[in-house]
């Protein structure tokens, strides 16, 4: 492994910064520091942790422009989206700063008069987090905030494509007064660091956002030391548009869900399942809006869609489009690319496909790109079956004006997050997480602090 990691702008190929990488030994040293710091951090009062987290939140909001500029440079997403990410991520710190004071125990009626039973909650211990490149700021704060609020220490291993946001967040945390050994950042070989995290008995919890195959490896490797795990894994989100839907609303929300961050999110609508009676109108209106999107460098004025993060992601998107077209799909918008292998820059013009069927790879594989395949249905149970025909169960969307139909759809979709006439359901106040192979645990809401807490009960003999 090289001693240095160079970070590049995916929109221009320009070098942003070169940073040192950590060896396995250095990661083990970071774990030891985290272990020692836990002894004092876990004993701090909830009010003190609340105060420090609020200061961190305020500093992030104060520096939102610089943080957003950094996100756009290392990730490529449009600047305004990056500002939104910073504020969204900061919201988790603000939320869990308050939740730190709401970690309650309870007393339990004892089976005999000679006993008292008291239940308490305690931090689980040092936590290791592995975070993705698509939200290099918010996926850190969404994990760090509840961990620190609960009294855990925290080590972040960010994605090698986008590590700079992690270091800047840590710098602001230290400025807020959070001790350096309580919140640490390490970067290096992903497999090597993952193995150090999972094998160390001093790490008591692993939290990961990323692909399902990698999540499974982390879970297996964590079993030997019986770690707590939180996994926010892959998605393959359906978006159902029923025959009575408000088509203009469905198009507007599909645009927001599908093309945000160039389609590179785990909750992006990946399959548009549209009633056959309105397919033509929906497809025409969607294509009209897609054609208005501007592709380019996220720092340029008016850009809506930035680059694909790397060559591997680009080639997967192209292969899905090619496979669909070979099997009979029609490209009614986009379908063109701009690639520069010398600079490592890859752009996909937002694409809409019709005449899609289940023989095509795009119906079974997460795309992670700005491609909207439209498949039709005639009966709502057929739509639900299509939606559930996947091992994933993170997010789903549907559009109907019939409340009975809406309740029926929501109760039969096998997904942890569902948007009804809403293409952007994620919120700090709500529990984010998936079913089936899309993960374990929830982030956000009152549930978000639970994975970082142990339950202990004390039986007192009188």
Curated annotation (Swiss-Prot):
Q: Which gene produces this protein?
A: gabD
InterPro entries for this protein:
Ald_DH/histidinol_DH, Ald_DH_C, Ald_DH_CS_CYS, Ald_DH_N, Aldehyde_DH_dom, Aldehyde_DH_NAD(P), Aldehyde_DH_Superfamily, Succ_semiAld_DH
What protein name is recorded for this chain?
Succinate-semialdehyde dehydrogenase [NADP(+)]
Report the PANTHER family cross-referenced here.
SUCCINATE-SEMIALDEHYDE DEHYDROGENASE, MITOCHONDRIAL (PTHR43353:SF5)
State the Gene3D superfamilies in the record: Aldehyde Dehydrogenase, Chain A, domain 1, Aldehyde Dehydrogenase, Chain A, domain 2
Catalytic activity, as annotated: succinate semialdehyde + NADP(+) + H2O = succinate + NADPH + 2 H(+)
* Catalytic residues identified in the record: 232, 266
Expression induction per the record is: Transcriptionally regulated by GabR in the presence of GABA. Up-regulated under low pH conditions and ethanol. Expression from the gabD promoter was induced by growth in the presence of glutamate.
Q: In which pathway does it act?
A: Amino-acid degradation; 4-aminobutanoate degradation
PROSITE patterns with a match to the protein in the record: ALDEHYDE_DEHYDR_CYS
Q: Which family does it belong to?
A: Belongs to the aldehyde dehydrogenase family.
Q: Where does NADP(+) bind?
A: 133-134, 157-160, 210-211, 233, 366
What does the record give under GO molecular function? succinate-semialdehyde dehydrogenase (NAD+) activity; succinate-semialdehyde dehydrogenase (NADP+) activity
The record's keywords, sorted A to Z, are: NADP, Oxidoreductase
Knockout consequence? Cells lacking this gene are unable to use GABA as sole nitrogen source. No effect on vanillin degradation.
> Which Enzyme Commission number(s) are on file for it?
1.2.1.79
Remaining remarks? Expressed from the major gabT promoter and from an additional gabD promoter.
- Which one GO biological process term can you cite for this protein? aldehyde metabolic process
One Pfam family per UniProt = Aldedh
Report the top EC class in one word: oxidoreductase
The reply on keyword NADP is yes
Q: What job does this protein perform?
A: Catalyzes the NADP(+) dependent oxidation of succinate semialdehyde to succinate.
């Amino acid at each position: 492994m090289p001693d240095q990691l160079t970070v590049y702008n995916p929109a221009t190929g320009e070098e942003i910064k070169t940073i040192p990488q950590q060896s396995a030994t250095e990661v083990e040293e970071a774990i030891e520091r985290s272990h020692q710091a836990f002894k004092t951090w876990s004993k701090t009062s909830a009010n003190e942790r609340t105060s420090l987290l609020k200061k961190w939140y305020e500093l992030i909001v104060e520096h939102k422009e610089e943080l957003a500029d950094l996100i756009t440079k290392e990730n490529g997403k449009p600047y305004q989206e990056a500002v939104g990410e910073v504020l969204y991520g900061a919201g988790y710190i603000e939320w869990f700063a308050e939740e730190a004071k709401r970690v309650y125990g309870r007393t339990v009626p004892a089976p005999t008069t000679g006993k008292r039973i008291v239940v308490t909650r305690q931090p689980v211990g040092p936590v290791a987090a592995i975070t993705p490149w698509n939200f290099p700021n918010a996926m850190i704060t969404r994990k760090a905030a509840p961990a620190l609020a609960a009294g855990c220490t925290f080590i972040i291993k960010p994605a090698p494509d986008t590590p700079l946001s992690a270091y800047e967040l840590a710098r602001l945390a230290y400025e807020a007064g959070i001790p350096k050994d309580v919140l640490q950042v390490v970067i290096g070989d992903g497999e090597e660091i993952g193995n150090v995290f999972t094998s160390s008995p001093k790490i008591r919890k692993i939290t990961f956002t990323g692909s399902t195959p990698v999540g499974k490896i982390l879970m297996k490797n964590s079993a030997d030391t019986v770690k707590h795990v939180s996994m926010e894994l892959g998605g393959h989100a359906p978006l159902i548009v029923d025959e009575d839907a408000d088509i203009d609303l469905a198009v507007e929300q599909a645009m927001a869900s599908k093309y945000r961050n160039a389609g590179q999110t785990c909750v992006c609508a990946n399959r548009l399942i549209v009633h056959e009676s309105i397919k033509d109108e929906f497809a025409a209106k969607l294509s009209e809006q897609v054609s208005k999107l501007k592709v380019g460098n996220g720092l340029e004025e008016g850009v809506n869609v930035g680059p694909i993060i790397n060559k591997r992601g680009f080639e997967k998107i192209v292969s899905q489009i090619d496979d669909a077209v070979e099997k009979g799909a029609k490209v009614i918008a986009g379908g063109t690319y701009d690639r520069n292998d010398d600079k490592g820059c890859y752009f996909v013009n937002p694409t809409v496909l019709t005449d899609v069927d289940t023989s095509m790879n795009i119906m079974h594989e997460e795309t992670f790109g700005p491609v909207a395949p439209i498949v039709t249905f005639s009966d709502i149970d057929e739509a639900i079956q299509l939606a559930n025909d996947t091992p994933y169960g993170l997010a789903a969307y549907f559009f109907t004006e019939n409340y009975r139909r809406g309740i029926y759809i929501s109760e039969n979709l096998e997904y942890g997050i569902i948007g009804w006439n809403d293409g952007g359901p994620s919120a700090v106040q709500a529990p984010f997480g998936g079913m089936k192979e899309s993960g374990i645990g929830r982030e956000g809401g009152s549930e978000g602090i639970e994975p970082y807490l142990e339950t202990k009960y004390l039986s007192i003999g009188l």
